[in-house]
Amino acid sequence: MTTFTKPLSKLIGHFEKFPGIGPRTAQRLALFILKQSESSIRDFSKALLEAHSNVGHCKKCFNLTSEEECDICRNAERNQNIICVVAETKDLLALERAREFKGVYHVIGGLISPMDSIGPEILEIRSLVERVSKSEIDEIILALTPSVEGDTTSLYIGKLLTPFTKVTRIAYGLPMGSELEYVDEVTLARALEGRTNLI
């Protein structure tokens, strides 16, 4: 078994904490970093710190942004009366790649999962209800992962929002447990077109 010097092992360990990064990929990334010039490493470190310090959440939809409101919420050409609810920013990005949805979003920050001690109170569901209750919203589209957690979250949100507006859920041409970020653009576009009433 290959052993690395302590600083290199530490660097590999940090990369292994990244989602989807296994030991081999972490090792490749660490070795790549070591081949870079000192100025490149400084630039990389600066970019990491700047992103961490300056990127926060949109006060309206909780998408990532460096402004008070994200570009989508500030875009006058977007339909502000249709809100697509997603679990994470990565799901929003996947839907934007499909170029089908012309409304705005609400990022709730995860899915209800009692097994992982994630209840609705720690997600941005209350802010969604407030947003809908104070505005003229024509439709809420739930675009949550097809899983037990996604279904639970969709039903919970649906019951809260149905008194205020129409609530639909995107159709799925993918198996249970699939992540939205890995679904191709055509499938996502069709899922939006084929959405159905939740309740």
Swiss-Prot record:
Keyword terms, alphabetized: DNA damage, DNA recombination, DNA repair, Metal-binding, Zinc, Zinc-finger
Top-level lineage group: Bacteria
Domain Toprim: 81-175
Entry annotated with the keyword DNA repair: yes
Keyword Coiled coil: no
Positions of transmembrane segments: none
GO MF term list: DNA binding; zinc ion binding
GO biological process terms on file: DNA recombination; DNA repair
SUPFAM superfamilies: Recombination protein RecR (SSF111304)
Pfam families, per database record: RecR_C, RecR_HhH, RecR_ZnF, Toprim_4
ZnF region ranges: C4-type: 58-73
Function per UniProt: May play a role in DNA repair. It seems to be involved in an RecBC-independent recombinational process of DNA repair. It may act with RecF and RecO.
HAMAP family: RecR (MF_00017)
Family per record: Belongs to the RecR family.
Full protein name: Recombination protein RecR
Organism listed in the record: Prochlorococcus marinus (strain MIT 9515)
Gene name as annotated: recR
